[in-house]
Amino acid sequence: MVEEYSTEEEFLKKYDYKSFERPSVTVDIAVFGVLGEEVDSYRKDEKKSISLLLVKRGEHPFKGKWALPGGFLTENDESVEKCAEREVFSETNVKPRSLFPIGTFSAKGRDPRGWIISNAFVSVVSEDGVNAKGGDDAAEARWFKGNFTAVEDSEGKTKKLYRLSMTSGDTTLCALFEKIGCHFGRDEFFHEKAAK
């Protein structure tokens, strides 16, 4: 039987928030950098390239692995947006000019530390003059240039497989994606497996 309360104040005095499972809340930020390179032509055009800012984790779990900058919401953060700004700057020394929410990931079992709800953001910054460096629990921060190419079979025919390569110095991160369809003019991809 549900107990009835005459006022909200009475209800809140007896309310026990500990009786509900509480996940941790985090943010993850995909920071894209746009870099302009002058092209040698009479027009002095600029060739633009795009990179993704990644951090090498300095602590467990996944110590030594490359990841998006991010971290846990604390009591000092006013919002997940403020948390995202704080985490990007503390881990990379890069100040995002704007943050756009792109999704929330809440499935249990995604993180070995427990049930974590992650709020994902994207930010685009000019890479010119930005010195990314690791800080806080990030051992290192680097810009990785992206390349998305179709995978050809032995006969030179393009399959529905695509390779995403992210490169910084002597480090290359790769993944294979399969094109699974086109709906309403938009291609859909499925992450196949890590590529070597």
Label the predicted regions.
Residues 1-196:
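N-terminal leader/linker segments that precede catalytic domains of diphosphate-processing enzymes
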